A protein has these predicted regions:
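Extended ligand-binding clefts on enzyme/binding-domain cores
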Residues: 143, 164, 183, 194-322, ...
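Well-ordered alpha-helical scaffold segments within catalytic/enzyme domains
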Residues: 38-43, 88-106, 147-162, 202-215, ...
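Extended ligand-binding groove/face enriched in aromatic
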Residues: 79-82, 86-88, 92-201
Length: 338
């Protein structure tokens, strides 16, 4: 009969140096947590209102400094497409701020110059992980092509005249239209062999903008996409799914908080009524209070994690950082001021 081996008690060595180090680390965590908590509590019980110009300006300048110092590259440590999306979202902020200041010609000039630089910077990202492992029919995949094309649209809306960017918008829109029209299921892949239908919303919105600017009919690509999404809702939540299989009827991953927030931020421009229905259901099922006057959004239904092919940034107590952050945009575009 074999004898059970008892492991010896763990030996813990405590030195003055280790004590000092632990105290220092605790102070760092407490100081950063305090600043974050104070910032959150300052917004407790507030309904939607336009942010003060100085607040927008200070946040924008801070993000500008971080991107120019290379901090965008660090985001790739959290999600594979983090660096790309950091730059794209920064570009969207340039467009939005400029549109909110129609008489500020000096800022618009700055915005156009920064957008030209930004587009030049992110275009080579199609050759980086994870975008380089996609189908050659849509190089970089729909996340890459859709967001960069929408950024071109913003540049043109602001009055940009760079001929390369304008020509790229034409060719990129045609490429996306063909990709959606020929794909079965009716959405191109996001990464190599992987498809998340909601990732197509940015691409479809860029096609809508091309139609408005140049009188094309690329928005027809929305019809097949919408029909598939409406007929393949998650049976558990009656919300849009996150990931589909390669065939036309397989649901790989049901509703996800980050995917819903991402898509609902733009869905009103494609189908306002469908977006209203989806947002109302999403708000009722997925929004969770987590402090005095604060709301977060679950990453999974009822906060219970399921097996998945992809992560979506930090998740704490079921609440998703990406789902909650993107949910602010979803709330605004769906007229939720609470």
């Amino acid at each position: 009969m074999m004898k059970q081996y008892n492991k010896p008690d763990k030996i813990i060595i405590v030195t003055p140096g280790s004590i000092v180090l632990n105290i220092f680390l605790i102070l760092v965590v407490v100081s950063h947590s305090y600043g974050t908590l104070v910032g959150l509590l300052s917004h407790a019980d507030q309904t939607h209102k336009e942010a003060p110009c100085f607040d927008i300006e200070s946040q924008f300048n801070g993000i500008t400094r971080r991107i120019e110092s290379g901090e965008d590259e660090l985001q790739g440590a959290f999600i594979p497409e983090g660096c790309f999306l950091s730059n794209v979202f920064y570009g969207y902020s340039l467009v939005n701020i400029s549109l909110s200041r129609p008489t500020d010609s000096s800022f618009r000039k700055i915005a156009l110059k920064k957008l030209e630089h930004l587009l030049t910077k992110v275009e080579p990202y199609q050759n980086r992980v994870p975008f380089k492992y996609t189908d050659n029919s849509l190089p970089g995949g729909v996340i890459y092509q859709g967001n960069i094309n929408r950024l071109r649209a913003g540049y043109i809306i602001l009055g940009g005249s760079n001929s390369k960017i304008i020509n790229d918008f034409h060719s990129g829109s045609k490429l996306l239209f063909l990709a959606f029209s020929e794909a079965n299921p009716p959405f191109p892949e996001s990464f190599g062999g992987l498809t998340w239908p909601v990732d197509g919303v940015c691409a479809l919105d860029s096609l809508r903008l091309h139609d408005e600017l140049f009188k094309t009919t690329y928005s027809q690509a929305c019809d097949k996409w919408l029909a598939w999404m409406k007929s393949h809702l998650d049976p558990q939540t009656s919300l849009m799914i996150a990931q589909a299989g390669k065939d036309s009827d397989t649901i790989v991953d049901g509703t996800r908080g980050c995917a819903m927030s991402w898509s609902l931020a733009l869905l009103p421009t494609i189908d306002k009524e469908f977006s209203r229905q989806q947002y109302q259901r999403f708000r009722e099922q997925w929004f969770q209070p987590f402090g005095p006057g604060l709301l977060g959004i679950n990453e999974w239904y009822q906060g219970k994690q399921r097996p998945t092919d992809f992560q979506a940034g930090p998740v704490f107590a079921g609440l998703g950082a990406a789902a909650t952050g993107l949910g602010i945009a979803a709330a605004k575009t769906n007229a939720d001021s609470e």
